[in-house]
């Protein structure tokens, strides 16, 4: 088992080598717009997963993920050779290319947040003109329980302003 720090360094180096090779050395039209975003190497340094995204031909154009995946599969051997020469490790890791869905997740979250903001704005507009149903104060003041009296009972103030003391004797059985 290799050190996790060594695996991270190797993954970073693989990311750099593969991105540079795709941009400057491999002339495949299917790799136009492919960007290497990350790489992960297993603890034994034998397998590397390289994550990529694909840009569309225009800002509004849909990227061709199938063509990019096919082009990366065609270039896998050349890229592994370049990784082996560039890293200097005893065993060159096998490369697996996986589409990075982080940007898709970000776009989806942005859409959900925009919908939530719009729903909040609609609710705020409705709330401005809303009036309570029924009376202005639907809760009647039937009396409130205040502090205990000196006799040990509770003083109850009614809405008429009268005070009554509840000593708790109502619930005791008489002898």
Curated annotation (Swiss-Prot):
Keywords: Cytoplasm, Ribosome biogenesis. Its main location: cytoplasm. The gene is rbfA. One of several proteins that assist in the late maturation steps of the functional core of the 30S ribosomal subunit. Associates with free 30S ribosomal subunits (but not with 30S subunits that are part of 70S ribosomes or polysomes). Required for efficient processing of 16S rRNA. May interact with the 5'-terminal helix region of 16S rRNA. GO terms for cellular component: cytosol. It is found in: Cytoplasm. It comes from the Bacteria. Residues 162-175 have a biased composition (Acidic residues). Residues 131-175 are annotated as: Disordered. GO terms for biological process: maturation of SSU-rRNA. Belongs to the RbfA family. Pfam families: RBFA. The keyword Phosphoprotein does not apply. This is Ribosome-binding factor A. GO terms for molecular function: ribosomal small subunit binding.
